[in-house]
Amino acid sequence: MKWDWIFFDADETLFTFDSFTGLQRMFLDYSVTFTAEDFQDYQAVNKPLWVDYQNGAITSLQLQHGRFESWAERLNVEPGKLNEAFINAMAEICTPLPGAVSLLNAIRGNAKIGIITNGFSALQQVRLERTGLRDYFDLLVISEEVGVAKPNKKIFDYALEQAGNPDRSRVLMVGDTAESDILGGINAGLATCWLNAHHREQPEGIAPTWTVSSLHELEQLLCKH
């Protein structure tokens, strides 16, 4: 294995992130049956907020509260309380993706392993502990704590500084979102691997080093490279 460091995104790269199920579970505590239509309405608000967050236009707190503002008004609850309940629900239901544990075992001892995530601090540590994967990772970099999000090159520069400034030609970034994980890795001068499990069309102007459809495929690839 030619890599000194392999960095992963977290959500939908190493861990499942079924936000619909998490929201359904969370809203049960408020006697609300959260429907597919409700989820569509939620995503219509949530997705643009994530784009704004990744572009540095809003803070993590504005994102976390903004996505629940309409529900907070309906339920007469603080949006921060709904957000906290959602994160707790997600921590309970998140599991490693198929092939994640096998892949981490294959890498461990051959390269150092890190996470660079745009997710939020409250979820990351709890999820790593609950899934039993905490000890696999040498470094955990969370955008909320750094103050910038992928694809901003600064979060990658920060991660590499924390990693001891390894040779960037010997660092690989793996993620499922081309517009943040892969573009950011490219901007930082890293090799990249796009986990494209849903066979999305490759965005124009973003050219990953490799593209795989599963973590099993990535493990096989790393055995050769």
UniProtKB/Swiss-Prot annotation:
The keyword Manganese is annotated on this UniProt entry: yes
InterPro entries the UniProt entry points to: HAD-like_sf, HAD-SF_hydro_IA, HAD-SF_hydro_IA_YjjG/PynA, HAD_sf, PGP-like_dom2, Pyrimidine_5'-ntase_YjjG
GO biological process per UniProt: pyrimidine nucleobase salvage; pyrimidine ribonucleotide catabolic process; response to xenobiotic stimulus; thymine metabolic process
Activity control mechanisms: In contrast to nucleotidases from other families, is not inhibited by ribo- and deoxyribonucleoside di- and triphosphates.
Protein family according to the UniProt entry: Belongs to the HAD-like hydrolase superfamily. YjjG family.
GO MF term set: 5'-deoxynucleotidase activity; 5'-nucleotidase activity; manganese ion binding; nucleotide binding; phosphatase activity; thymidylate 5'-phosphatase activity
Organism whose genome encodes this protein: Escherichia coli (strain K12)
Listed cofactors: Mn(2+); Mg(2+); Co(2+)
Active-site positions on this chain: 9
pH dependence: Optimum pH is 7.5.
Domain of life: Bacteria
Signal peptide: none
Entry EC number(s): 3.1.3.5
Cofactor note text: Divalent metal cation. Highest activity with Mn(2+) followed by Mg(2+) and Co(2+).
GO annotations of cellular component type: cytoplasm
UniProt name for this protein: Pyrimidine 5'-nucleotidase YjjG
Chain's gene name: yjjG
Entry keyword set: Cobalt, Cytoplasm, Hydrolase, Magnesium, Manganese, Metal-binding, Nucleotide-binding
